[in-house]
Amino acid sequence: MNDARSDLITLVLSIFAVLIFASLVGYVLHRRLSPDGSNSAVENLNARIKAWWIMVIFIGVAFLAGRAGVIILFAFCSFAALREFITLTNTKRADHWALASAFFVVLPIQYYLLWAEEYGIYSIFVPVYAFLLMPIISVLRGDTERFLIRIAEVQWALMICVFCASHVPALLTLNIPGYEDRNVLLIAFLVIVVQLSDVLQYVWGKLFGRTKIAPKLSPSKTVEGFAGGVASATLIGASLWWITPFTPLQAGMLSLVITLMGFFGGLVMSAIKRDRGVKDWGNLIEGHGGLIDRLDSVVFSAPIFFHLVRYWWSLT
């Protein structure tokens, strides 16, 4: 346990060092290239750095607090993300009981089952039980106008914001031989690799981006940015093998999988935003829009990462 805490502290301090360096670079760029705030690229970069400071502090404190801190943090994230998602849906008064059940019954039960390490139930609770419960509650109100669209939106919200997101702290429940009491480092690995991929795709795209991947969905995403960001994040993931139960090659392969899932997850969530006619999911995090804007890549990659690790490395 002491080794795990020591590795975690080393990792957190390293991230703080990187953020300090990034903040200094951002300050210099602001003074030289955007003293009046007119350079959108520089201002966007500094907004991202400020948001990263806030997120890293919260995540770092949760990690150091242990299992309870991590589960509470992601339960809060699920609640906030679910609120953002539901705000953009077509729900009506007839759906209020279903929504109340989603927030105050389904979400708490999912995280309680995770806390109790009941994999057999929490792995199917939302996609089976909650999936069937939501339309039952709504149909009892008797309003059938746009019923399929309304209930599908609620089901999608639960799948993304609760089910997928809960697979991040679910990594704490895995029983990996020789890796006891170190599972929090798996979460650190997942979040760092996926989030760095997002940042590096942005940087590579700004420096070398020419060919847009999906102009209507996300104009800032380019082939060059995608390739450079994914490749860089994969190499960084391989270099972080020492905090995982993986070999460098395995860490690199898993990093490639989760960065690809994160990228496509971002595209899917961008498509939903465009369908709703909005630029961001919310304004909770300055410089990053809503919580979903920041975590979309993580929640898409988390279930894949969890099940790959559980199948190949875990005893349970």
Language-model regions: role of each:
Residues N2-L260:
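Membrane-embedded alpha-helical bundles of polytopic integral membrane proteins
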Residues N175, L308-T316:
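Juxtamembrane boundary at the C-terminal end of a transmembrane helix
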Residues R276-S297:
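Interfacial loop-to-transmembrane junctions
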Residues R294-Y311:
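Final/C-terminal transmembrane alpha-helix of multipass membrane proteins
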Residues G205-G209, K273-R276, V299, P303-I304:
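Re-entrant/interfacial helical elements at transmembrane boundaries that shape
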